[in-house]
Amino acid sequence: MLNIGYHESTANGLEGLGLEALEVGANTFAFFTRNPRGGKAKDIDEVDAQKLCKIMEENNFAPVVAHAPYTMNPCSADPGLREYAKQMMIDDFARLEYIPNSLYNFHPGSHTGQGSDVGIDLTSTMISEVFKTVKNTSTKLLIETMAGKGSEIGRTFEEVKQIIDLAEQKFGSSLKSRLGVCLDTCHIWDGGYDIVSNLDGVIEEFDKIIGLENLYAIHLNDSMNPLGAHKDRHEKIGKGHIGFETLYKVTRHPKLCNLPFILETPNEQSGYIEEIKMLKK
């Protein structure tokens, strides 16, 4: 069974996330843990969270994917912004305990002129420090693959692997069970990975460098840009440079097909319903 959903609004509460997923034929979804541009978070309604968990359990949902706010930059040159990112992440882990076994993905950040090596070191430090505070959690932290826009880190599989390895060195080997990767099809395409002509080769490269055992979710997006543009502009499924055929193959690939697939395409609900129907055929 295809595990698919899309990025939903939390305007109708946590139960509303589950109800919306059921309404559109989804069995997973993504949501922002807090205001994506500002960082403010609503208080968790425990009863509301319990209702969501009941929906998920009764309908055999795949793991859901919480998304950290865009304002989080763990490798900023500003120590205050790095601390802000760390405290937001720690708070998000506490909030996500109300939705057990969630996945929590974040953008590894932009080094803002310090250089990729410094950025990678700073982000790995934050991950280590977060888990020194978050002692026990059922939530897994996922580093998202990035397109390489501006000074973003995580633009290559090698950079993502460096972040993981450094974080483990700083925290200890037990971090391995808490940390993974979320692969974004638009981002890796814009980053130069040709999944249209060489999907198997890209998957093999990911496995060789990072390990498919560390891949826990996929953001399924088409791209407005040609291969290697480093721009990160999502497009509707089948309307961009990646195309429906390739994205359909991604969802059916034997090494990927059991993962949760999250649509982040520029759509209203009706568009997501249509994309889910297309991909389920």
Predicted regions and their residues:
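Acidic (Asp/Glu)-rich catalytic clusters
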Residues: 19-25, 45-65, 90-100, 131-137, ...
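Acidic/histidine-rich catalytic cores of soluble enzymes
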Residues: 29, 130-237
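C-terminal helical cap(s) of enzyme catalytic domains, especially alpha/beta-barrels
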Residues: 269-281
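N-terminal pre-domain/capping segments
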Residues: 1-68, 72, 76-94
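Active-site beta-loop-alpha junctions enriched in small/polar residues
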Residues: 7-11, 34-36, 68-71, 109-111, ...
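Conserved, mostly hydrophobic/aromatic
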Residues: 21, 67, 85, 96, ...
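Active-site acidic/histidine proton-transfer and metal-coordination neighborhood
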Residues: 58, 74-180
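Charged helix-capping and loop-helix junction motifs
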Residues: 45-50, 82, 86-89, 120-124, ...
